[in-house]
Swiss-Prot record:
Chain intervals with Pro residues compositional bias: 218-228
Localization annotation: Nucleus; Cell junction, Adherens junction; Cell projection, Dendrite; Perikaryon
Residue positions where Omega-N-methylarginine is found in the record: R209, R261, R279, R293
Ranges where the record places region Disordered: 1-50, 134-238, 256-309, 429-480, 514-533, 1064-1131, 1152-1176
Compositionally biased tracts (Polar residues): 22-50, 172-207, 265-276, 296-309, 466-475, 1072-1081
Gene responsible for this protein: Ctnnd2
Induction statement: By retinoic acid.
ARM repeats: 391-433, 537-576, 579-618, 623-663, 679-721, 725-770, 832-872, 904-943, 997-1040
GO BP annotations, alphabetical order: cell-cell adhesion; learning; morphogenesis of a branching structure; regulation of synaptic plasticity
Mod. after translation: O-glycosylated. Phosphorylated by CDK5. Phosphorylated by GSK3B.
Composition skew (Low complexity), residue ranges: 149-160, 1087-1100
Tissue expression per record: Expressed in neurons and glial cells. Isoform 2 was found to be the most predominant isoform in various brain regions. Expressed at neuromuscular junctions.
Organism the protein comes from: Mus musculus (Mouse)
Protein name per its UniProtKB record: Catenin delta-2
Transmembrane regions listed in the UniProt entry: none
Length: 1247
């Protein structure tokens, strides 16, 4: 505060003023931060005149603003174009220049201004009426006709200066209004003087020091504080230890032009006339406002105060900066003082209606700017579109032109603005409460539309401008945290209300302008958008157009990383669910640019580029995009990024892109070649926990829940069906098989057993188990003893006692080679590792545990299919084909050891682990594909004599129940079974009754004949030919048991029912062999009573098979479900959709909040432009974006079934075509020949 002037002193070089009485002077100095001037007599008439002059000035200002509204709207549009994001220089300086004029009002704000003007006029009329009724104001001095010109002067004077600078209605010190007390009757004269000084400039950072500094007169020491004000100070003010060195900051008037720097803003005259206060430059002609002494009856200060406080609803804030239309807030401790301060009440309410810039610059010392510039910029540069750069720059240049260059640089808007195009999108720090920053609790808020509170002053507190503190305290009190608007120089801060903020800021409600906060408050509560980030604007204030697609693609090459990142994120948003946009992006070269960004140095750019690529390559309809990405070098670029990045989100995105790419058949081998090693070593092994097996259980579960692991296993699941070469490379990849099995084993007994990761691992192992004997060196090498037994054994076929399910073998070898499931495995000296784990019997237990505990149908199908593949045939020393056998004969040294019969061991291990009841129980599950896989697995298990007996005894009714037709109650449910499943059940029944009359009798007892006859006699399209012929084969085999024919006839069946379809089969049998056709089936040639399906072949048959080897190979390839020409067939997909409701195309959310990657299309990507669209499960390109990106559902087009070949039986030596070949939809039934059943071993079913 300023000390009282000495008697006769002439402040600022003006005429001397009479001395005030000590009491009045002391009160003035304690209550006013403005100039300590007074008219000597304290006349009430001058007070009234001052009030009237100020009110008229306000009305004139409002009137002028009303006239300029229309013109301003037209200019705003042109000014907004300068704020575009793609300015040539990329900086705020390119938006506009200081010489241009700016208008604030936009069309959206017109109605608010007009409402404010109307309300302001009503309140002014009420104030005038109160003055007239109290006798203070002469009715002739004011009339309603004068009202239109009365309000204009207090409004903003925009574009009134040739230099184009903004003139604000008051300096920010006008916020530091002091509360008047009822004990200060003589303060009104001084306040009237201050009211007329509203437009003066202050050349010092403090309100009251302007006069002293301009006149080079040192400021007297502040007087001691007064008691009455001490309680109301709270923690809002403190006395600095020393005046700040950089306090000489200049601020021009916000309402009127700046006066000459060396002159006095106020000139006080005497000499027979009332004291007259002139505003320097208050009008272009420099007119002065005089307040005649006799303009109204003389009133006492107390009467004046009473009349204002009781009759007028208007609150006036009078401060050292004049009548300022700025609402201010103070701690509630001064609330009682405010209610008794009439002048405060009047001007503060009028100020509420005025339109002013929300740009409250916070000026600090240079060291504080360097420390808090970002925070200041976030809260201080809240301005209108036109003022984004040029207005604030012009105001600074006019207001701070006298500063030193270093200080001027600190004041410049460019000093505050964080680079828009740098590494990140700017986020405003939250506002902080002053009282909290000082350690005091925030006082409760006071509600009310026109709530006005002021920060009290004290004679003992120097009225230097308040400073925003740099405190980083926690969130504000939810009850009443108001925004701070600190003043310019160093010193304490107080709480001020944001003039454009009606709501209280609290921890539970984020800022309406926050990029990631909740929805915006209602329209009525917000009038301005304070955002200075040109990337995102308040949609109510700024009508930005969406950029065109070529513009967005061009921005991918921008020099600033943040522009590239935002452009990629916007592309991700645009192509969400829109295949046309995806194709257009490809045509315009967007994929190449996005791939180039994968090698960028900025992590944020990687994140956005991967998100966009993931959406672009999602879906089978976008295979062209996938191939384009591959042609652009995208797969190696993704692998490089995966290898070097440590960001978990980016790793998830990269593996998600690879998962989507892997659904394209043409890209499976390129992914195997470029990404298999990195996926295994950088993702699968580390995230599985296999290398660190002693991990804690919770750690294991966390790893198995990893999105990165899920994506990587999904990718490998797809590529594992790419053919023999792909399977070979994956089997030989060190650590892959071990890690996949470890994931499965560690998930057993936990909730993770149904997870997508476990499902993927099981499906990979199932595919790798396909054709294991033929595609591994172990299956292609055999001992000479086994070959001798195969080729030189007894050929008469009469020694049926020595033949069994595994074919004819030498008696001396039988005991050595077979394992009954009890005791240790023969020929197993060391524990299995690597590829050996695929076929070792120890793998049976994890598979069976999955089958008994898991509820995921895809996992169940995968585990059953893996057992089916492993149990197919006896491939221990047998070659898959004649070529392999011949190779073995030539390459194996004499006396080479034979390999164990792993398929025999697998079947025995399933029985030992009580797996047969588990498989039979799954026949009852209501899932077509699971039933199909389980039925085929049971068929392969029945190759074991003991298993066949158990299945015939305990599973026959379940198998028959799955056949369509008959009178069973679930007939409708059975009809829903697919042809593949019905065929699998028929093949299982055929294997079970082969060479087992008891099982054939059990089939008759279970009512199977009726259903089988119904299928074989069906006409039309009720059943496919494949199903009809499979059922006929079972009936033909049953008729071979002569002992059971009497029972059949007793039940009313005749030979016609059993062999009615044999004529067709006979024709196929009699058809000569050709190089283009495989042998057909003839159930008549060999009776199942005399010949087992797994009986050994004679040398003659071996030679004939050698000639047909090539035919089997080609037929098998054509029949494969996962063939080189495509892994999904429309038939298979249709079957899946109709019968299980589950598509082979899995859409996994990627990190999105929904399963679209949403398991989230994860919303991902939300884009600020469309906040309502929630997509990017997971991932927000912008701080406020909802994640709605197309988070491409990773299409697990992993054939839930092993590759086509997996389901196709292994043809060749061990194929019993009568079972296996039925599974091939591509091969006509007539091409199958029953002769193949004579060869030992049983092929894998194709399921």
């Amino acid at each position: 505060m300023f000390a009282r002037k000495q008697s006769g002193a002439a402040p600022f070089g003006a005429m001397p003023v009479p001395d005030q009485p000590p009491s009045a002077s002391e009160k003035n100095s304690s209550l006013s931060p403005g100039l300590n001037t007074s008219n000597g007599d304290g006349s009430e008439t001058e007070t009234t005149s001052a009030i009237l002059a100020s009110v008229k000035e306000q009305e004139l200002q409002f009137e002028r603003l009303t006239r300029e509204l229309e013109a301003e709207r037209q200019i705003v549009a042109s000014q907004l174009e300068r704020c575009k994001l793609g300015s040539e220089t990329g900086s705020m300086s390119s938006i506009s220049s200081a010489g241009e004029q700016f208008h604030w009002q936009t069309q959206d704000g017109q109605k608010d201004i007009e409402d404010e003007l109307t309300t302001g006029l009503e309140l002014v009329d009420s104030c005038i009426r109160s003055l007239q009724e109290s006798g203070i104001l002469d009715p002739q001095d004011y009339s309603t006709s004068e009202r239109p010109s009365l309000l204009s002067q207090s409004a903003l004077q925009l574009n009134s200066k040739p230099e184009g600078s903004f003139q604000y209605p008051a300096s920010y010190h006008s916020n530091q209004t002091l509360a008047l007390g009822d004990t200060a009757p003589s303060q009104l004269p001084a306040r009237s003087t201050q009211a007329r000084a509203a437009g003066q400039s202050f050349s010092q950072g403090t309100t009251g020091r302007a006069g002293h500094l301009a006149g080079s007169e040192p400021a007297p020491p502040p007087p001691p504080p007064r008691e009455p004000f001490a309680p109301s100070l709270g923690s809002a003010f403190h006395l600095p230890d020393a005046p700040p060195a950089a306090a000489a900051l200049y601020y021009s008037s916000s309402t009127l032009p700046a006066p000459p720097r060396g002159g006095s803003p106020l000139t006080t005259t005497q000499g027979g006339s009332p004291t007259k206060l002139q505003r320097g430059g208050s009008a272009p002609e420099g007119a002065a406002y005089a307040a005649p002494r006799g303009s109204s009856p003389k009133q006492s200060p107390s009467r004046l105060a009473k009349s204002y406080s009781t009759s007028s609803p208007i609150n006036i804030v009078v401060s050292s900066a004049g009548l300022s239309p700025i609402r201010v807030t103070s701690p509630p401790t001064v609330q009682s003082t405010i209610s008794s301060s009439p002048i405060h009440q009047l001007s503060s309410t009028i100020g509420t209606y005025a339109t002013l810039s929300p740009t409250k610059r916070l000026v600090h010392a240079s060291e504080q700017y360097s420390k808090h510039s970002q925070e200041l910029y976030a809260t201080a540069t809240l301005q209108r579109p036109g003022s984004l750069a040029a207005g604030s720059r012009a105001s600074y240049s006019s207001q701070h032109g006298h500063l030193a260059p270093e200080l001027r640089a600190l004041q410049s808007p460019e000093h505050h603005i964080d680079p828009i195009y740098e590494d990140r999108v700017y986020q405003k720090p939250p506002m902080r409460s002053l009282s909290q920053s000082q350690g005091d609790p925030l006082p409760p808020a006071h509600t009310g539309t026109f709530r006005t509170s002021t920060a009290p002053s004290s004679p003992g507190v120097d009225s230097v401008p308040l400073q925003r503190t740099g405190s980083q305290h926690g969130p504000q009190n939810a009850a009443a945290a108001t925004f701070q608007r600190a003043s310019y120089a160093a010193g304490p801060a107080s709480n001020y209300a944001d003039p454009y903020r009606q709501l209280q800021y609290c921890a539970s409600v984020d800022s309406p302008y926050s990029k990631s906060g909740p929805a915006l408050p209602p329209e009525g509560t917000l009038a301005r958008s304070p955002s200075i980030d040109s990337i995102q604007k308040d949609p109510r204030e700024f009508g930005w157009r969406d950029p065109e697609l070529p513009e967005v693609i061009q921005m991918l090459q921008h020099q600033f990383p943040s522009v590239q990142s935002n452009a990629a994120a916007y592309l991700q948003h645009l192509c969400f669910g829109d295949n046309k946009i995806k194709a257009e992006i490809r045509r315009q070269g967007g994929i190449q640019l996005l791939v180039d960004l994968l090698d960028h140095r900025m992590t944020e750019v990687h994140r956005s580029a991967c998100g966009a690529l993931r959406n672009l390559v999602y879906g089978k309809a976008n295979d062209d995009n996938k191939i384009a990405l591959k042609n652009c070098g995208g797969i190696p670029a993704l692998v490089r990024l995966l290898r070097k990045t440590t960001d978990l989100e980016i790793r998830e995105l990269v593996t998600g892109v690879l998962w989507n790419l892997s659904s394209c058949d043409a890209l499976k081998m390129p992914i195997i070649q470029d990404a298999l090693a990195v996926l295994t070593n950088a993702v699968i092994i580390p995230h599985s926990g296999w290398e660190n097996s002693p991990l804690q259980d919770d750690r294991k579960i966390q790893l198995h829940s990893s999105q990165v692991l899920r994506n990587a296993t999904g990718c490998l699941r797809n590529v594992s069906s790419a053919g023999e070469e792909a399977r070979r490379r994956m089997r030989e990849c060190d650590g892959l098989t071990d890690a996949l099995l470890y994931v499965i084993q560690s998930a057993l007994g936990s909730s993770e057993i149904d997870s997508k990761t476990v499902e993927n691992c099981v499906c990979i192992l199932r595919n790798l188990s396909y054709r294991l004997a033929a595609e591994t060196s172990q299956g292609q090498h055999m001992g000479t003893d086994e070959l001798d037994g195969l080729l030189c054994g007894e050929t008469n076929g009469k020694d049926t006692e020595s033949s069994g399910c595994w074919g004819k073998k030498k008696k001396k070898k039988k005991s050595q080679d077979q394992w009954d499931g009890v005791g240790p495995l023969p020929d197993c000296a060391e524990p299995p590792k690597g590829i050996q784990m695929l076929w070792h019997p120890s793998i049976v237990k994890p598979y069976l545990t999955l089958l008994s505990e898991c509820s995921n149908p895809d996992t169940l199908e995968g585990a059953a299919g893996a057992l089916q593949n492993l149990a197919a045939g006896s491939w221990k020393g047998w070659a898959e084909d004649v070529a392999g056998m011949a190779y073995a004969l030539r390459s194996l040294p004499e006396g080479a050891p034979c390999l164990p019969q792993w398929s025999v061991y697998i079947r025995a291990a399933v029985r030992k682990e009580k797996g047969l009841p588990i498989l039979v129980e799954l026949l009852r599950i209501d899932n077509d594909r699971v039933v199909c896989a389980v039925a085929t697995a049971l068929r392969n298990m029945a190759l074991d004599v003991r298993n066949k007996e158990l299945i015939g005894k305990y599973a026959m009714r379940d198998l028959v129940h799955r056949l369509p037709g008959g009178n069973n109650s679930n007939n409708s449910g059975s009809k829903a079974m697919s042809d593949d499943t019905v065929t699998a059940v028929c093949c299982t029944l055929h294997e079970v009754i082969t060479k087992n009359m008891e099982n054939a009798k059990a089939l008759r007892d279970a009512g199977g004949i009726e259903k089988l006859v119904g299928i074989s006699k069906s006409k039309g399209d009720k059943h496919s030919p494949k199903v009809v012929k499979a059922a006929s084969q079972v009936l033909n085999s049953m008729w071979q048991y002569r002992d059971l024919r009497s029972l059949y006839k007793k039940d009313g069946w005749s030979q016609y029912h059993f062999v009615a379809s044999s004529s067709t089969i006979e024709r196929d049998r009699q058809r000569p062999y050709s190089s283009s056709r495989t042998p057909s089936i003839s159930p008549v040639r060999v009776s199942p009573n005399n010949r087992s399906a797994s009986a050994p072949a004679s040398p003659r048959e071996m030679i004939s098979l050698k000639e047909r080897k090539t035919d089997y190979e080609s037929a098998g390839n054509n029949a494969t479900y996962h063939g080189t020409k495509g892994e999904h067939t429309s038939r298979k997909d249709t079957m899946t959709a109709q019968n299980t409701g589950v598509s082979t195309l899995y859409r996994n959310s990627y990190g999105a909040p929904a399963e679209d990657i949403k398991q989230n299309q994860v919303s991902t990507q939300p884009v600020p432009q469309e906040p309502s669209r929630k997509d990017y499960e997971t991932y927000q390109p912008f701080p406020n974006s909802t994640r709605n990106y197309d988070e491409s559902f990773f299409e697990d087009q992993v054939h839930h079934r092993p590759p086509a070949s997996e389901y196709t039986m292994h043809l060749g030596l061990k194929s019993t075509g009568n079972y296996v070949d039925f599974y091939s939809a591509a091969r006509p039934y007539s091409e199958l020949n029953y002769e193949t059943s004579h060869y030992p071993a049983s092929p894998d079913s194709w399921v």
